Amino acid sequence: MRHYEIVFMVHPDQSEQVPGMIERYTGAITEANGKIHRLEDWGRRQLAYPIQDLHKAHYVLMNVEAPAETIEELETAFRFNDAVLRNMVMRTKVAVTEASPMAKAKDERDSRRGPAGDRSYDEANAEEIAE
């Protein structure tokens, strides 16, 4: 079996359907004895240029190991699903399991926020000290 990196973008109004789509696509891969090495839901992000007068889309990244027939089925499913704006399937030489640069950047932002949620750790401590 070969390794593939798959990215697809979903219409922002259909974001609530993304978990079901992910489950359907990963199910097709695992049924064909494939493996999911990495699955990242990047959420809604700004597009570099408008697609169908849209400025945002919901991004999903998958790194999989699957037979070519299964990948062809996925590409056909992407093509006939109106909610999928764009998709890209690339064959890779090895399985990629480490976090993508997008996921790493998100983790860094989350760790910098500290335990207070949206406020920075210093702001939360300054308020506690002032009281």
UniProtKB/Swiss-Prot annotation:
The GO molecular function terms of this record are: small ribosomal subunit rRNA binding; structural constituent of ribosome
Skewed-composition ranges (Basic and acidic residues): 104-122
Enumerate the Gene3D superfamilies for this protein: 3.30.70.60
User: Which CDD domains does this chain map to?
Assistant: bS6
Q: SUPFAM superfamilies given for it?
A: Ribosomal protein S6
Alphabetized Pfam families for the sequence? Ribosomal_S6
Q: Name one GO cellular component term.
A: cytosolic small ribosomal subunit
Annotated region (Disordered), positions in chain: 96-131
| Sorted UniProt keywords | Ribonucleoprotein, Ribosomal protein, RNA-binding, rRNA-binding
One GO term under biological process is:
translation
Q: Which domain of life is it from?
A: Bacteria
**Record carries keyword Transmembrane helix:** no
Chain's role? Binds together with bS18 to 16S ribosomal RNA.
As for family, the record states: Belongs to the bacterial ribosomal protein bS6 family.
UniProt cross-references to PANTHER family, sorted A to Z: MITOCHONDRIAL 28S RIBOSOMAL PROTEIN S6, SMALL RIBOSOMAL SUBUNIT PROTEIN BS6M
Under what name is this protein listed? Answer: Small ribosomal subunit protein bS6
Q: Which organism is it from?
A: Shewanella sp. (strain ANA-3)
